Amino acid sequence: MVATCLQVVGFVTSFVGWIGIIVTTSTNDWVVTCSYTIPTCRKMDELGSKGLWADCVMATGLHHCKPLVDILILPGYAQACRALMIAASVLGLPGILLLLTVLPCIRMGHEPGVAKYRRAQLAGVLLILLALCAIVATIWFPVCAHREITIVSFGYSLYAGWIGAVMCLVGGCVIVCCSGDAQSFGENRFYYSSGSSSPTHAKSAHV
Protein backbone atom coordinates (compact mmCIF):
# COMPACT_ATOMS: atom_id res chain seq x y z
CA MET A 1 0.00 0.00 0.00
CA VAL A 2 2.85 2.37 0.84
CA ALA A 3 4.57 1.61 -2.47
CA THR A 4 1.33 2.30 -4.34
CA CYS A 5 0.91 5.68 -2.64
CA LEU A 6 4.51 6.60 -3.43
CA GLN A 7 4.00 5.71 -7.09
CA VAL A 8 0.98 8.01 -7.29
CA VAL A 9 2.79 10.80 -5.41
CA GLY A 10 5.80 10.46 -7.71
CA PHE A 11 3.59 10.63 -10.80
CA VAL A 12 1.60 13.68 -9.68
CA THR A 13 4.71 15.54 -8.50
CA SER A 14 6.59 14.81 -11.71
CA PHE A 15 3.66 15.75 -13.94
CA VAL A 16 3.16 19.13 -12.26
CA GLY A 17 6.90 19.76 -12.39
CA TRP A 18 7.02 18.92 -16.09
CA ILE A 19 4.26 21.43 -16.78
CA GLY A 20 6.36 24.04 -14.97
CA ILE A 21 9.34 23.18 -17.18
CA ILE A 22 7.24 23.62 -20.32
CA VAL A 23 5.99 27.01 -19.08
CA THR A 24 9.56 28.11 -18.41
CA THR A 25 10.76 26.97 -21.82
CA SER A 26 7.99 28.72 -23.74
CA THR A 27 7.97 32.08 -21.92
CA ASN A 28 10.48 34.94 -21.89
CA ASP A 29 10.17 36.47 -18.42
CA TRP A 30 13.37 34.88 -17.12
CA VAL A 31 15.13 37.99 -15.79
CA VAL A 32 13.92 41.57 -15.32
CA THR A 33 16.45 44.13 -16.53
CA CYS A 34 16.85 47.79 -15.64
CA SER A 35 19.73 50.25 -15.66
CA TYR A 36 18.21 52.31 -12.82
CA THR A 37 15.59 51.63 -10.17
CA ILE A 38 12.39 49.89 -11.24
CA PRO A 39 10.15 53.02 -10.78
CA THR A 40 12.60 55.10 -12.82
CA CYS A 41 12.75 52.50 -15.56
CA ARG A 42 8.97 52.34 -15.68
CA LYS A 43 8.77 56.10 -16.19
CA MET A 44 11.49 56.03 -18.84
CA ASP A 45 10.07 52.91 -20.53
CA GLU A 46 13.35 51.08 -19.97
CA LEU A 47 12.13 48.22 -17.81
CA GLY A 48 12.69 45.02 -19.75
CA SER A 49 12.78 41.27 -19.51
CA LYS A 50 15.01 38.73 -21.17
CA GLY A 51 14.37 35.09 -21.99
CA LEU A 52 15.51 32.32 -24.27
CA TRP A 53 13.53 33.48 -27.28
CA ALA A 54 13.06 37.26 -27.02
CA ASP A 55 14.08 40.51 -25.38
CA CYS A 56 11.05 42.43 -24.13
CA VAL A 57 10.36 46.00 -23.04
CA MET A 58 7.61 46.53 -20.48
CA ALA A 59 6.00 49.96 -20.38
CA THR A 60 2.67 51.08 -18.91
CA GLY A 61 0.05 49.05 -20.71
CA LEU A 62 2.50 47.87 -23.38
CA HIS A 63 4.65 44.78 -23.76
CA HIS A 64 6.88 44.75 -26.82
CA CYS A 65 9.19 41.83 -27.57
CA LYS A 66 12.01 41.46 -30.09
CA PRO A 67 12.48 37.81 -31.12
CA LEU A 68 16.02 36.43 -30.91
CA VAL A 69 16.11 34.71 -34.29
CA ASP A 70 19.70 35.35 -35.37
CA ILE A 71 21.55 32.33 -34.01
CA LEU A 72 24.93 33.60 -35.25
CA ILE A 73 24.92 36.58 -32.87
CA LEU A 74 23.16 34.79 -30.01
CA PRO A 75 25.49 34.20 -27.03
CA GLY A 76 26.70 30.65 -26.53
CA TYR A 77 25.13 30.34 -23.09
CA ALA A 78 21.71 31.25 -24.48
CA GLN A 79 21.96 28.60 -27.19
CA ALA A 80 23.08 26.01 -24.64
CA CYS A 81 20.22 26.91 -22.29
CA ARG A 82 17.77 26.61 -25.17
CA ALA A 83 19.06 23.13 -25.94
CA LEU A 84 18.90 22.08 -22.28
CA MET A 85 15.33 23.33 -21.79
CA ILE A 86 14.12 21.75 -25.04
CA ALA A 87 15.77 18.47 -24.00
CA ALA A 88 14.09 18.71 -20.59
CA SER A 89 10.68 19.31 -22.15
CA VAL A 90 11.10 16.42 -24.61
CA LEU A 91 12.40 13.97 -22.00
CA GLY A 92 9.35 14.67 -19.88
CA LEU A 93 6.90 13.22 -22.42
CA PRO A 94 8.19 9.61 -22.49
CA GLY A 95 8.92 9.81 -18.77
CA ILE A 96 5.35 10.78 -17.90
CA LEU A 97 3.84 8.26 -20.35
CA LEU A 98 5.98 5.43 -18.97
CA LEU A 99 5.09 6.45 -15.44
CA LEU A 100 1.42 6.50 -16.34
CA THR A 101 1.54 2.88 -17.52
CA VAL A 102 2.99 1.62 -14.23
CA LEU A 103 0.29 3.09 -11.99
CA PRO A 104 -1.71 0.44 -10.09
CA CYS A 105 -4.93 1.46 -11.85
CA ILE A 106 -3.42 0.78 -15.30
CA ARG A 107 -3.18 -2.82 -16.45
CA MET A 108 -1.64 -3.88 -19.76
CA GLY A 109 -2.62 -7.51 -20.27
CA HIS A 110 -1.00 -10.13 -18.07
CA GLU A 111 2.45 -8.59 -17.96
CA PRO A 112 4.70 -9.57 -15.04
CA GLY A 113 5.53 -7.13 -12.28
CA VAL A 114 9.16 -6.97 -13.38
CA ALA A 115 8.11 -5.32 -16.66
CA LYS A 116 6.31 -2.54 -14.79
CA TYR A 117 9.25 -2.21 -12.43
CA ARG A 118 11.70 -1.71 -15.31
CA ARG A 119 9.46 0.89 -16.93
CA ALA A 120 9.16 2.71 -13.63
CA GLN A 121 12.93 2.78 -13.20
CA LEU A 122 13.40 4.09 -16.74
CA ALA A 123 10.75 6.77 -16.18
CA GLY A 124 12.41 7.82 -12.94
CA VAL A 125 15.82 8.14 -14.62
CA LEU A 126 14.32 10.24 -17.44
CA LEU A 127 12.69 12.56 -14.91
CA ILE A 128 15.93 12.98 -12.99
CA LEU A 129 17.79 13.81 -16.22
CA LEU A 130 15.01 16.27 -17.09
CA ALA A 131 15.39 17.97 -13.74
CA LEU A 132 19.18 18.21 -14.02
CA CYS A 133 18.93 19.80 -17.49
CA ALA A 134 16.43 22.37 -16.21
CA ILE A 135 18.46 23.15 -13.08
CA VAL A 136 21.63 23.77 -15.10
CA ALA A 137 19.82 26.00 -17.61
CA THR A 138 17.89 28.08 -15.06
CA ILE A 139 21.04 28.76 -13.04
CA TRP A 140 23.44 29.24 -15.94
CA PHE A 141 21.26 31.73 -17.84
CA PRO A 142 20.85 34.46 -15.16
CA VAL A 143 24.50 34.17 -14.12
CA CYS A 144 25.76 34.75 -17.67
CA ALA A 145 23.09 37.34 -18.50
CA HIS A 146 24.13 39.38 -15.46
CA ARG A 147 27.56 39.89 -17.04
CA GLU A 148 25.96 41.57 -20.06
CA ILE A 149 23.04 43.51 -18.59
CA THR A 150 21.85 44.82 -15.24
CA ILE A 151 19.46 42.36 -13.66
CA VAL A 152 17.22 43.71 -10.92
CA SER A 153 15.09 40.63 -10.26
CA PHE A 154 14.15 37.20 -11.53
CA GLY A 155 11.01 36.70 -13.60
CA TYR A 156 8.18 34.25 -13.08
CA SER A 157 9.56 31.98 -15.82
CA LEU A 158 12.70 31.35 -13.81
CA TYR A 159 10.76 30.64 -10.62
CA ALA A 160 8.50 28.23 -12.51
CA GLY A 161 11.60 26.48 -13.83
CA TRP A 162 13.18 26.12 -10.40
CA ILE A 163 10.00 24.79 -8.83
CA GLY A 164 9.34 22.46 -11.76
CA ALA A 165 12.89 21.11 -11.74
CA VAL A 166 12.80 20.40 -8.01
CA MET A 167 9.42 18.68 -8.31
CA CYS A 168 10.65 16.49 -11.18
CA LEU A 169 13.81 15.66 -9.25
CA VAL A 170 11.82 14.69 -6.16
CA GLY A 171 9.29 12.72 -8.22
CA GLY A 172 12.01 10.87 -10.12
CA CYS A 173 13.88 9.99 -6.93
CA VAL A 174 10.68 8.73 -5.31
CA ILE A 175 9.97 6.49 -8.30
CA VAL A 176 13.51 5.14 -8.51
CA CYS A 177 14.24 4.68 -4.81
CA CYS A 178 11.02 4.46 -2.84
CA SER A 179 8.23 2.94 -4.95
CA GLY A 180 9.01 -0.69 -4.20
CA ASP A 181 10.62 -3.63 -6.01
CA ALA A 182 9.49 -5.82 -8.90
CA GLN A 183 7.38 -8.01 -6.60
CA SER A 184 5.43 -5.04 -5.26
CA PHE A 185 4.60 -3.95 -8.82
CA GLY A 186 3.21 -7.40 -9.47
CA GLU A 187 1.13 -7.40 -6.31
CA ASN A 188 -0.38 -3.94 -6.79
CA ARG A 189 -2.90 -5.12 -9.35
CA PHE A 190 -6.61 -5.44 -8.69
CA TYR A 191 -9.40 -7.33 -10.40
CA TYR A 192 -13.16 -7.32 -10.02
CA SER A 193 -14.94 -10.50 -9.02
CA SER A 194 -18.66 -10.84 -8.46
CA GLY A 195 -19.67 -13.36 -5.83
CA SER A 196 -23.03 -14.95 -5.22
CA SER A 197 -24.03 -12.40 -2.61
CA SER A 198 -22.37 -9.08 -3.41
CA PRO A 199 -19.58 -7.66 -5.58
CA THR A 200 -16.16 -7.69 -3.95
CA HIS A 201 -12.74 -6.36 -4.81
CA ALA A 202 -9.79 -8.66 -4.33
CA LYS A 203 -6.06 -8.29 -4.80
CA SER A 204 -4.31 -10.77 -7.09
CA ALA A 205 -0.76 -11.76 -6.23
CA HIS A 206 1.52 -12.80 -9.08
CA VAL A 207 4.79 -14.56 -8.46
Curated annotation (Swiss-Prot):
UniProt-annotated location(s): Cell junction, Tight junction; Cell membrane
Source organism per entry reads: Rattus norvegicus (Rat)
Q: What is its main location?
A: other
Where on the tree of life does the source sit, at the highest rank? Eukaryota
Function, as annotated: Plays a major role in tight junction-specific obliteration of the intercellular space, through calcium-independent cell-adhesion activity.
Q: Which GO terms describe its cellular component?
A: axon; basal part of cell; bicellular tight junction; neurofilament; plasma membrane; tight junction
Q: Membrane topology for this entry?
A: Multi-pass membrane protein
The subunit structure is:
Interacts with tetraspanin-3/TSPAN3. Interacts with OCLN.
Q: What is this protein called?
A: Claudin-11
Q: Which UniProt keywords apply?
A: Cell junction, Cell membrane, Membrane, Phosphoprotein, Tight junction, Transmembrane, Transmembrane helix
Pull the Extracellular topological domain ranges from the record: 23-82, 144-157
Q: Which GO terms describe its molecular function?
A: identical protein binding; structural molecule activity
Cytoplasmic topology: which positions? 1, 104-122, 179-207
Q: Which residues carry this modification: Phosphoserine?
A: 193-194, 197-198
Q: Transmembrane ranges?
A: 2-22, 83-103, 123-143, 158-178
Q: Which GO terms describe its biological process?
A: axon ensheathment; bicellular tight junction assembly; calcium-independent cell-cell adhesion via plasma membrane cell-adhesion molecules; cell adhesion; spermatogenesis; tight junction assembly
**InterPro entries (alphabetical):** Claudin (IPR006187), Claudin11 (IPR003555), Claudin_CS (IPR017974), PMP22/EMP/MP20/Claudin (IPR004031)
Family of the protein in this entry: Belongs to the claudin family.
